[in-house]
A protein has these predicted regions:
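Active-site-proximal helix/loop segments of hydrolytic enzymes
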Residues: 1-138
């Protein structure tokens, strides 16, 4: 059984000026999503809702460490009902590491150095999450 699930992406937007990194976690039951894909009344309970507190700890730990290592703008931790995270049988987050539609971020995403910093930020975030979980379960 998995302890956590991360889905790692490079984002895209209509505007080439969109930039930064963001982390999505499952929307809590009874609330609208903070992304435009989930608005409009989908307030259903999903499999991953039972991990709401753990999802929040994971999302914030990954986002804060990704920011430190990437040096990019903070788009925040947001809530969404993306299928890949809402069906996860464990704490889960979807990480957006930059925008391929932004010329500067596309250039960065093509470099091994930036991808290594992003990877290290995510690893540091997972380690921070594990520390938080171990403290919470003492």
């Amino acid at each position: 059984k998995a302890d956590l699930f991360l889905s790692i992406h490079a984002d895209g937007a209509v505007s080439s000026s969109a930039h930064g990194v963001e982390t999505f976690i499952t929307t809590a039951a009874g609330f609208d999503s903070s992304n435009h894909y989930g608005k409009g009344g989908d307030q259903s309970v999903v499999l991953n809702n039972r991990y709401n507190a753990a999802n929040a700890m994971l999302g914030y730990a990954v986002q804060s460490n990704l920011l430190k290592m990437s040096g990019r703008s903070d788009r925040g931790v947001r809530r969404a009902r993306f299928a890949v995270i809402k069906k996860a049988p464990c704490p889960a987050a979807l990480v957006e590491c930059g925008f391929l539609t932004n010329p500067e971020e596309e250039r960065l995403l093509r470099t091994e150095a930036y991808r290594s910093r992003v990877a290290q930020g995510i690893v540091n975030g997972v380690r921070a999450y594990r520390t938080l979980v171990s403290r919470a379960t003492r």
